Amino acid sequence: MPVRVGINGFGRIGRNVLRAIAEAGRTDIEVVGINDLAPVETNAHLLRFDSVHGRFPGEVTVKGDAISVGNGLIKVTAIKEPATLPWRDLGVDVALECTGIFTSKDKAAAHLAAGAKRVIVSAPADGVDLTVVYGVNHDKLTPHHKVVSNASCTTNCLAPVAKVLNDAVGIDKGFMTTVHSYTNDQPSLDQVHKDLYRARAAALNMIPTSTGAAKAVGLVLPELAGKLDGVAIRVPTPNVSVIDFKFVAKRATTKDEINGAVKRAAEQQLKGILGYTEAPNVSSDFNHDAHSSVFAMDQTKVMDGTLVRVMSWYDNEWGFSNRMVDTAVAMGKLI
């Protein structure tokens, strides 16, 4: 039986989760409910037409209070409080909390009260049972994990790389900069924002700001807890981001050893999660790439044997949404 999921919040991630399931033709998971405060016709329109990822690869129609996608009919509601969502009636196994609002275990657990058996938050979340980066630590999931976080798109990019390199040469300490496309958290023109950097026009500026993505790797890989930090620079592109990661190796290494370790992992245990490229690529080449992280081989630098710099691309929307799907299936199997 497929894992039955309900999506709360049909924004960039919510829509891409549904699209990822549809595009892959997955039969191990199905969306049975969507909750979003926008009109159902608006949600259907934004699913059909996407400025970043193009048209939805299939027919999307509105039938009363439901959206028809392919052969499936998905119930759509507009309810503010997650605890009153119809997850029990819809037989929801896993609720995907994609509003960006209910980002703590206490708040996200309202989906359990509504009848969902498990909850995945599409953002870093406080107090959750586990922070999951699929491919890195999803094997730690147990039936006792009821509310988990899917981490962030940036943590999903960095963690596979950090795991491979820590296993290969050891990471004493490291610092990441993510050059990140703008998101809906930023205005198109200057306006009031609690972060004065993010108050500035997204498409007109390179914007230094904060990120907890590097530190969060320690939640996924405890052996790296306290060893990583990072910052973000938001840039005027609508999608695709890149991490620039510098670290001090625990022993002397070479560019060939670093690249070789990543290539082996990408072709074996992390296939489909970690990719690599040997071409002189730019950001648009990775739009709609389902990998969590695509390592740029020609960007690896090593100084004095132990100071290492690497770079890895990620589609911050599409890769993350695909991992939400993978994690939901993994959790569903444990119910």
PLM features: what roles do these ranges have?
Residues H144-H145, A201-A203, V240-D244, L307-R309:
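Short, solvent-exposed beta-strand edge segments and adjacent coil->beta transition regions
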Residues G170-A232, P238:
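Catalytic core of tubulin tyrosine ligase-like
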Residues K140-T142, R198, V235-S241, V302-G305:
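Short, flexible turn/loop "capping" segments at secondary-structure junctions
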Residues G230, V242-I335:
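C-terminal active-site/capping subdomain that shapes the small-molecule cofactor and substrate pocket
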Residues L37-P39, A125-D126, S152-T154, T178-D185, ...:
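Glycine-rich beta-alpha junction loops
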Residues F10, G14, S104, A151-T154, ...:
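Generic structural signal for well-ordered, non-membrane alpha-helical segments
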